[in-house]
């Protein structure tokens, strides 16, 4: 299995290519790192390959906010310039600058 370099970074605002939601990336897995049950719950005809980066998003749609786990092939940059209204954005990021969020720096112990 070849591990690819991630196309997106923590703080990037992205949107799903097929479903109507967007969000800010707060973590990246270099390959699929969720449960087999979760992966098998995706219809086979649209199931992404596991050997690509997967992203943890603070996501939103027109109705609610939530966290999402999305394959790289299903994401694209969101060029709207709008902030993400997820209530946990402030736990991970300080401010939005030039269309992306600046991660909080965490002191090392």
Residue ranges and their predicted role:
Residues 15-24:
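Short coil-to-beta-strand transition motifs
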